[in-house]
């Protein structure tokens, strides 16, 4: 059972996921390979923006920029209570985890949008982490 605040977070996360998949799928359907290129670049830009903002917030708080602080200090979004992972390692240099339940992946599956989900995961995370780490 989820709290009212958690339910709001769940609705926000699902709404964002649905918006991304509908937009990305339509762009790719309309423009083909060029559309996929556009979606990938836009997703990387979003990742870089979030990474840059999180980096600046941590610098403003005098937090050392490393993997531990990226995943352990002042998250930029509320955590989705449905998300489950085995965190295998989190140090200043390395993060290793195994995702058990990803609510975004469940939405992509439900909407038949695995391609959009794959693009998001391939492009967003790397761009976000690199921008956070190196600015």
Question: What label would you give each PLM region?
Answer:
Residues 1-124, 131-134:
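N-terminal accessory segment detector
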